[in-house]
């Protein structure tokens, strides 16, 4: 009983304080996803998986930078690299390593446009 109550009190703040994506983050994730989906002919299901992973990475990176109060571009690169590795791992589980890398390269192309 104590473990259950403790678990509930520890898990609630995770959901209450979880950061919601901003309109710009959603727009950015949609732009990247649409570009990648068109280039690689992703199914709707695969497109949704890629969108969720991309949006999660964008939101997580922004939250981590804000949490740490990072302003230095070199320090931000460390956060972005960690986020890249996380999304690569997620996509590799679904699509395989080679396709995941190709999708992420296309995602980087979309960011530059």
Question: For the regions a protein language model found, what residue spans apply to each?
Answer:
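Charge-rich (acidic/polar
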Residues: 19-113
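Bacterial Sec-dependent N-terminal signal peptides
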Residues: 1-24
């Amino acid at each position: 009983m104590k473990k259950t109550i403790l678990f509930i009190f520890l898990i609630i703040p995770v959901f209450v304080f979880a950061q919601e994506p901003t309109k710009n983050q959603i727009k950015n994730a949609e732009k990247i996803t649409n570009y990648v989906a068109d280039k690689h002919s992703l199914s709707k299901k695969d497109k949704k998986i890629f969108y969720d992973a991309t949006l999660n990475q964008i939101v997580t990176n922004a939250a981590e930078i804000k949490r740490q109060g990072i302003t230095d571009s070199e320090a931000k690169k460390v956060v972005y690299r960690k986020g890249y590795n996380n999304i690569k791992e997620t996509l590799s589980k679904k699509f395989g390593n080679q396709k995941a890398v190709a999708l992420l390269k296309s995602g980087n192309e979309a960011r530059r446009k």
